[in-house]
Amino acid sequence: MEKFKAAMLLGSVGDALGYRNVCKENSTVGMKIQEELQRSGGLDHLVLSPGEWPVSDNTIMHIATAEALTTDYWCLDDLYREMVRCYVEIVEKLPERRPDPATIEGCAQLKPNNYLLAWHTPFNEKGSGFGAATKAMCIGLRYWKPERLETLIEVSVECGRMTHNHPTGFLGSLCTALFVSFAAQGKPLVQWGRDMLRAVPLAEEYCRKTIRHTAEYQEHWFYFEAKWQFYLEERKISKDSENKAIFPDNYDAEEREKTYRKWSSEGRGGRRGHDAPMIAYDALLAAGNSWTELCHRAMFHGGESAATGTIAGCLFGLLYGLDLVPKGLYQDLEDKEKLEDLGAALYRLSTEEK
């Protein structure tokens, strides 16, 4: 249970750390961000208070997803209606938090009063952003057991396409939910990318079954898989026989900026549903159990560092708990008690059959 609580908390910590960078327009390069952090005394001396270190829309939407998942729904359609209600309820809080534009657009299309079609939104050519990935980690907490894979796939796809009805967007939510479930299962980190790609055809099959936007999806489906396959080959972990990620000899903050931009589809690392989880995963592979190193790689770069920080922080919490993280980063965190309560509730529900 403690690690589930840590996952919810540290996702929010990663969000707050990364969001502060996104807000500082002048700090657009990882090297500069890290130098600034050192001048202020480093991570050990930071206290994340809500006034100084607010969370972004990533945490607000993640909390909304978790709240829906911890209600007493008796079928998945009821869960989706509850998600719609939660998202519509909090959407007015989002504009001041610099949200992924597709999140706002998607929430505007939700129909809480339409019982049958509440969560059916139109295909969105611009719905490929990171916002689906950053609100879905808790789905992996709720359905982490291997025998719940089918449910995890369905819920993460539906949750994702409520706001990001585009394969690059909603496959991001599948990816983060799967990574969280793999962490909870104790699966070796180096296998996660391969096993996630093996689940993508199951998501495609589910989308075909639900007969929504199949033609539009087909056109964009390949992009997500191709980007991830390329990444796994670059790190030499695409085959089952490969069990150690290989990094370049020189992979400092400046080189990482270039690499993150290369992975992106528009030159801003972490902007889309494929590369926000990718940067977080890359950071976890390189950082091991070092929270500081994780922050340098996932929370302090010139791209969408709030998105990558949210995903990386959540996964780190589930893998390693809170012991390796300075207390000041979470003791006064915005919505701390709510996040801990949701983590505990998700743990309890995930261990009961439903």
From Swiss-Prot:
Signal peptide: none
Pfam family, one: ADP_ribosyl_GH
Keyword terms, alphabetized: Cytoplasm, Phosphoprotein
A GO cellular component entry from the record: sarcomere
Entry's Gene Ontology molecular function annotations: ADP-ribosylarginine hydrolase activity; magnesium ion binding
Stored Gene3D superfamilies: ADP-ribosylation/Crystallin J1
Compartment(s) where it occurs, according to its Swiss-Prot or TrEMBL record: Cytoplasm, Myofibril, Sarcomere
GO biological process: cardiac chamber ballooning; cardiac myofibril assembly; protein de-ADP-ribosylation
Residues bearing PTM Phosphoserine: 27
InterPro entries attached to this UniProt entry: ADP-ribosylarg_hydro, ADP-ribosylglycohydrolase, Ribosyl_crysJ1, Ribosyl_crysJ1_sf
Disulfide bonds: none
Function field: Required for myofibril assembly and outgrowth of the cardiac chambers in the developing heart. Appears to be catalytically inactive, showing no activity against O-acetyl-ADP-ribose.
UniProt family annotation: Belongs to the ADP-ribosylglycohydrolase family.
Name the record gives this protein: Inactive ADP-ribosyltransferase ARH2
Organism name: Homo sapiens
